[in-house]
């Protein structure tokens, strides 16, 4: 038995917080009608879909690269790092269940770029895969909901920025709050946080 694994990430564009990736191997009971691009789902429907994916997927894993790693590596490389961590989370689960060989025949990644997962792993990037490949759609949903929850929790830790509303994305209100009270500890210092600021 061999499986197809889908990987996607969320959080390239925000000014604050981590970039988050998910890797998913679907199960036969996973409802395919729920598996569409996470951006096309309302927050409530995303959470419903995420709960079903976690309940019915054969394997799933989440990977993170935090704001410090984003600043050190750049957002592209940090996203690839989060993807590798998500995939390795799945492989660790498989090994913990006694599997000597990782039974994944191919990994499909949303977008134009894919992470290096080792010579034994076939990886292919699929442009628009979050809307066409169910495994990637599922990963998109898990990545988005996991990151959103993290940002909502940080809204209470760092009040005044509105993280629960915009999840760190560069809205006008978010930029205004940065200009008013300065960046929080989880803001990405390598990003242009306010319009007049040059990225360093």
Where are these predicted regions, by residue range?
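RNase H-like, Mg2+-dependent phosphodiesterase core
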Residues: 1-200
């Amino acid at each position: 038995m061999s499986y197809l694994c889908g990987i996607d990430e969320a959080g390239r564009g925000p000014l604050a917080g981590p970039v988050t990736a998910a890797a998913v191997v679907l199960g036969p009971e996973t409802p395919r009608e729920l598996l569409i691009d996470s951006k096309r789902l309302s927050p409530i429907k995303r959470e419903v879909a995420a709960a079903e994916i976690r309940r019915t997927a054969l394997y799933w894993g989440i990977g993170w690269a935090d704001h410090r790693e984003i600043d050190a590596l750049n957002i592209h490389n940090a996203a690839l790092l989060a993807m590798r961590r998500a995939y390795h989370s799945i492989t660790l689960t498989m090994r913990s269940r006694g599997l000597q060989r990782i039974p994944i025949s191919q990994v499909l990644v949303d977008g134009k770029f894919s992470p290096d997962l080792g010579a034994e792993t076939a990886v292919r990037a699929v442009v628009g895969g979050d809307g066409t490949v169910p495994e990637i759609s599922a990963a998109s949903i898990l990545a988005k909901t996991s990151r959103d929850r993290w940002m909502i929790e940080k809204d209470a830790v760092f009040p005044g920025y509105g993280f629960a509303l915009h999840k760190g994305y560069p809205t006008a209100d978010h930029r205004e709050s940065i200009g008013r009270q300065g960046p929080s500890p989880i803001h990405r210092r390598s990003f242009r946080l306010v319009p007049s600021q040059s990225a360093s």
